[in-house]
Amino acid sequence: MQSLIGTGVALVTPFKKDFSVDIEALQRVVNFSIDGGVEYLVVMGTTAENATLTAEEKELVINTVIDVNKGRLPLVLGVGGNNTMQIVEELKTRDFSAFEAILSVSPYYNKPTQEGIYQHFKAIAEASPVPVILYNVPGRTASNMLPSTVIRLANDFDNVVAIKEAAGDMAQALKIIKDAPKDFLVISGDDMIALPIVLAGGAGVISVIGQGYPKEFSEMIRLGLNKKAVEAFKTQYFLSDCIDMIFEQGNPAGIKQVFQALGITENTVRLPLVSVDESLAERINDFVKNSIK
């Protein structure tokens, strides 16, 4: 899918200081990413703090992004969880007309076997009216979707079109790139190794830092896709300290501090997450201040 090549950003859900959803700030976040040149937007991913949003708030965020985007960029909707039947029901009842694809995380907490993971995504693929992006993030799910399972799904279902690979394991990403069907996309879910994955044949990234530095990060990925490694790595090295910092005390606390430093949103997150401490906030603020040209 050409629309999923390049940089997608996993949008935050901005909160006011009273922890209510800040719609005006969300509008600014969406426009900042679009104006910065990213290729697509991901709604209701992990970075959106969807686990601590009510059903009504989720719909508010989704509809706001659709309205602000106005069809300018492709949209991907996060539809995942550890209750397969519930996900299948959502896929059968929700209107997906505004979305290019869904992003579906491997089941967390239950710790399924590889066969369980396969059967979970088989049910999703058979129910989904739009293409499916698998999402492997073992640091959050406690179970790693192995390359053999990914490749099996890619071969068995035409609408399983990509994986967001966030195991942080280059060897694993390379095996999927090597063995998956020709048109299957390997999308990095790790900002720090996104460029190496792209240079190795990956299709791009679903990024966190990319919404704070959309122009720089998306251009870096485009350079990588065009095999202009030396030029691309200049941006990689420029942003590497900030990438480390935004994950130091958890996501999305770090990227929300970047947004606060940019004057786009508050840095508020909902419990059980907490905002970054004063020391890290100061370091992030200094980076942002010194990076503004």
UniProtKB/Swiss-Prot annotation:
The active site is at residues 135, 164. Coiled coil: none annotated. GO terms for cellular component: cytosol. SUPFAM superfamilies: Aldolase. It is an enzyme of class 4 (lyase). GO terms for molecular function: 4-hydroxy-tetrahydrodipicolinate synthase activity. Gene3D superfamilies: Aldolase class I. PROSITE patterns: DHDPS_2 (PS00666). It comes from the Bacteria. GO terms for biological process: diaminopimelate biosynthetic process; lysine biosynthetic process via diaminopimelate. Its EC number is 4.3.3.7. The record marks 46, 109 as: Part of a proton relay during catalysis. Belongs to the DapA family. Catalyzes the condensation of (S)-aspartate-beta-semialdehyde [(S)-ASA] and pyruvate to 4-hydroxy-tetrahydrodipicolinate (HTPA). This is 4-hydroxy-tetrahydrodipicolinate synthase. It comes from Flavobacterium johnsoniae (strain ATCC 17061 / DSM 2064 / JCM 8514 / BCRC 14874 / CCUG 350202 / NBRC 14942 / NCIMB 11054 / UW101). The gene is dapA.
